Amino acid sequence: MHCGPPDMVCETKIVAAEDHEALPGAKKDALLAAAGAMWPPLPAAPGPAAAPPAPPPAPVAQPHGGAGGAGPPGGRGVCIREFRAAEQEAARRIFYDGIMERIPNTAFRGLRQHPRAQLLYALLAALCFAVSRSLLLTCLVPAALLGLRYYYSRKVIRAYLECALHTDMADIEQYYMKPPGSCFWVAVLDGNVVGIVAARAHEEDNTVELLRMSVDSRFRGKGIAKALGRKVLEFAVVHNYSAVVLGTTAVKVAAHKLYESLGFRHMGASDHYVLPGMTLSLAERLFFQVRYHRYRLQLREE
C-alpha cells in the first residue's frame, strides 16, 4: 500500500497574546522617588492640613505566555510554541484521537452530503421489499446499510491513520522542524500538550499549507484552535508567502466556521477525493464517501 502524506485536517479555538510594555508612569514615579531621597525633608509650613497621599496604583495584570505564546480569556496559561522532540508521543496521541472521532461523523452525519448514496440506499430498501414483501425485513435494510457505512468508515480511516503515523507523524522533528518552510507548533496548558498544528511550504506557488490541526477534546471551546491557526498565518507573513491553503474532509459545521473566522475563503469541494490508504474496492465506493473542501487565505498578490 502506497502511503503519501495525507491532507486531512482536524478541526476544532485563543487569540495570540502580545507582550505589554511597561507603563511610562512607573518609570516617572521611580525617578521622583530617587530624587526625593537625595534631599532632607523641609519643615512643614504653617497652614491648612495637607491632603493625604494618593494610594499607590494597583498592579497591572500581565498576560500569560510570552514571545510565541498565547493567553486569552478562557485560555488561562495556554501558550503556543514550537514542537520539541520530547512531545512526539503526545502530539501523535492528539492527532490519532482527533481523526478517530471522524468515524461516526463520516458514517452517519456525512451521509447528508451525498444524495446519490441516499438514493441508492432507498432503491436497495425498495428492492428488498419488492422481493421479500416483508415490511420487517425492509425496515432492517437501513440499519444494515448504516452498519456497513460505519464498518467501512472505520476501515478506511484507520488505514489513513496508519499511513500518517508512518510518514510525517512518525518523526515530526525530521519532517516539519528541519526542512525550510515547514514548522510544527503545540498548544501547552499546565505543562501538557493540548493542541497541535503544522505548516508546510509549497515553493512552486509560494503558499503555505495548514496541516494536522487538532485539539484535545477535553480542552475545546477555549479558542485554542484559532490561536493555532493564527500561528500558521503569522508564520506565512513572516516568511513572505503569498497565501495559506488547507484541505479538509471535516463534516462538522464548527470546523468550517473556524476556518472562515480566520479569514479563509471556501474555494470549492470535491466528492471524489481519495484518502491515502483507500483500496478503491466496490464496497468502499458504496459505503464510504467523503467531501474534500479547499480553503485559501490570500495574504498578498503576486
From Swiss-Prot:
Positions of region (Disordered): 46-72
Bilayer topology term: Single-pass membrane protein
Subcellular location(s) per record: Cytoplasm; Microsome membrane; Mitochondrion membrane; Endoplasmic reticulum membrane
Entry's EC annotation: 2.3.1.17
Example of a GO biological process term: aspartate family amino acid metabolic process
Membrane among keywords: yes
Stored InterPro entries: Acyl_CoA_acyltransferase (IPR016181), GNAT_dom (IPR000182), NAT_camello-type (IPR050769)
Transmembrane stretches, start-end: 121-141
Biased composition (Pro residues): 46-60
Catalytic activity: L-aspartate + acetyl-CoA = N-acetyl-L-aspartate + CoA + H(+)
GO MF terms, alphabetically ordered: L-aspartate N-acetyltransferase activity
Domain of life of the organism encoding this protein: Eukaryota
Regulation: Aminooxyacetic acid (AOAA) blocks its activity in both cytoplasm and mitochondria.
Domain N-acetyltransferase: 143-283
GO annotations of cellular component type: cytoplasm; endoplasmic reticulum membrane; mitochondrial matrix; mitochondrial membrane; mitochondrion
Pfam families, A to Z: Acetyltransf_1
Role according to the record: Catalyzes the synthesis of N-acetylaspartate acid (NAA) from L-aspartate and acetyl-CoA. Promotes dopamine uptake by regulating TNF-alpha expression. Attenuates methamphetamine-induced inhibition of dopamine uptake.
PANTHER family (UniProt xref): GNAT FAMILY N-ACETYLTRANSFERASE, N-ACETYLASPARTATE SYNTHETASE
Disorder named in the UniProt entry: N-acetylaspartate deficiency: A metabolic disorder resulting in truncal ataxia, marked developmental delay, seizures, and secondary microcephaly.
Family the entry assigns: Belongs to the NAT8 family.
The protein, known as: N-acetylaspartate synthetase
Species this chain originates from: Homo sapiens (Human)
Gene: NAT8L
